[in-house]
């Protein structure tokens, strides 16, 4: 039951109606008996500054941040954890007296999942995209010791990501790749990561069709039955799904907000239940 004492949490994004975070986080609160509610908050890009101020004024205790707000959210926080600082994007905010502390849970979630999928030091990785999710994936790939090639439709965005991460992480091996050569780059890579919003509801555009092989690891930040995920499964590649990333980063966010270990299995089941009801 929601009362006057119920703590408020939410996710801000544009679009955000598709988000599965409310089911997942509310399942976690219910499992541990936390008096809290988590809601989706649609926020247009030009209104993110006032939205974060307003959420703080309304008493929200924590927020997740999704497309396209992660880089801007980081710049609006009073303090950032080391990973969010290195990545230049924040996807988890925790309330302080005067504002928000920012964290990046996408990056450690990616690292854990990619390592579990068998990514090894010295392997070559293709990262598609240069936004907040791609920056988190770049950090994870660098931490795992891979040679990262970044391809984005805007070449300057890919180059900027490479410069920023190279400055933040000594010894990082990053270079921009030509988006027009995406198919060849994917063929040469042991790891392929989609850090774009292609496949999200409301986002136009497609990636060129990529051919995968069984030895590759493929991570798609976008959850659901995406074209990329279908191609990876058909080829027998080791797929890290958007749902896996969502659960892992969401569990880390839950712990940041509550100080309690997240009931990750319950969170995953909540996503599966929604998928089964569709």
Curated annotation (Swiss-Prot):
Shikimate binds at residues 19-21, 66, 91, 106, 223. Pathway: Metabolic intermediate biosynthesis; chorismate biosynthesis; chorismate from D-erythrose 4-phosphate and phosphoenolpyruvate: step 4/7. Its EC number is 1.1.1.25. Keywords: Amino-acid biosynthesis, Aromatic amino acid biosynthesis, NADP, Oxidoreductase. The active site is at residue 70. NADP(+) binds at residues 129-133, 221, 242. Homodimer. Belongs to the shikimate dehydrogenase family. This is Shikimate dehydrogenase (NADP(+)). It comes from Anaeromyxobacter dehalogenans (strain 2CP-1 / ATCC BAA-258). The gene is aroE.
């Amino acid at each position: 039951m929601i009362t006057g004492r119920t703590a408020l949490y939410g996710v801000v994004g544009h679009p955000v109606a598709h988000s599965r975070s409310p089911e997942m986080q509310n399942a976690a609160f219910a499992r541990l008996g936390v008096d809290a509610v988590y809601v989706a908050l649609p926020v247009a890009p030009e209104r993110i500054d006032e939205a974060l101020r307003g959420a703080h004024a309304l008493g929200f205790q924590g927020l997740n941040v999704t497309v396209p707000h992660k880089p801007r959210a980081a710049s609006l926080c009073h303090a950032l954890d080391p990973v969010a600082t290195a990545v230049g994007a924040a996807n988890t905010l925790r309330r302080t007296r005067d504002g928000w502390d920012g964290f990046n849970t996408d990056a450690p979630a990616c690292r854990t999942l990619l390592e579990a999928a068998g990514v090894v030091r010295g392997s070559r990785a293709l990262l598609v995209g240069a936004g907040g999710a791609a920056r988190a994936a770049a950090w994870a790939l660098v931490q795992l010791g891979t040679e990262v090639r970044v391809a984005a439709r805007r070449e300057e965005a890919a180059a900027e990501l490479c410069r920023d991460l190279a400055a933040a992480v000594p010894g990082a091996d990053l270079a921009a790749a030509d988006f027009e050569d995406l198919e060849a780059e994917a063929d040469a890579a042991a790891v392929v990561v989609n850090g774009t919003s292609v496949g999200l509801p409301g986002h136009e555009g497609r990636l060129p069709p990529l051919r995968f092989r069984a030895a590759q690891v493929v991570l798609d930040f976008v959850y659901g039955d995406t074209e990329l995920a279908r191609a990876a499964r058909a080829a027998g590649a080791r797929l890290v799904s958007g749902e896996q990333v969502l659960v892992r980063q969401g569990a880390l966010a839950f712990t940041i907000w509550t100080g309690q270990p997240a009931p990750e299995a319950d969170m995953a089941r909540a996503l599966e239940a929604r998928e089964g009801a569709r």
